[in-house]
């Protein structure tokens, strides 16, 4: 690929995203599809754009993303994390701004496992006194 590109890996829940950024016009491609085509939900699109809007580089960089696993929310979060890491590799001075917004930290929350004898992770069967 291009020699003047930066790379970042992002993860959230069970999704993992590989993000490549290079100078361009602001085109975002996810799994060979446009951002608006890939994510139907506006909230997911907003999450993906957040770090770029924060550092005011929406029109300056092209993004090429491959993402696997998880659902819409997890994939959007993974892409955001990957974009943040790629931006830090692109320009280290952006780290403090992105850290203050909370984009640098990996969201470590995972789905809690279902336990034996319970309906879900914590939901107990209904209790009947009589």
UniProtKB/Swiss-Prot annotation:
UniProt keyword annotation of Ribonucleoprotein present: yes
One GO location term (cellular component): cytosolic small ribosomal subunit
Superkingdom to which the source organism belongs: Bacteria
Keywords: Ribonucleoprotein, Ribosomal protein
Record has Ribosomal protein as a keyword: yes
GO biological process: translation
A GO term, aspect molecular function: structural constituent of ribosome
Transmembrane region(s): none
Family: Belongs to the universal ribosomal protein uS9 family.
Record-linked PANTHER family: RIBOSOMAL PROTEIN S9 (PTHR21569), SMALL RIBOSOMAL SUBUNIT PROTEIN US9M (PTHR21569:SF1)
Protein name, UniProt field: Small ribosomal subunit protein uS9
Organism: Pasteurella multocida (strain Pm70)
Gene this protein is translated from: rpsI
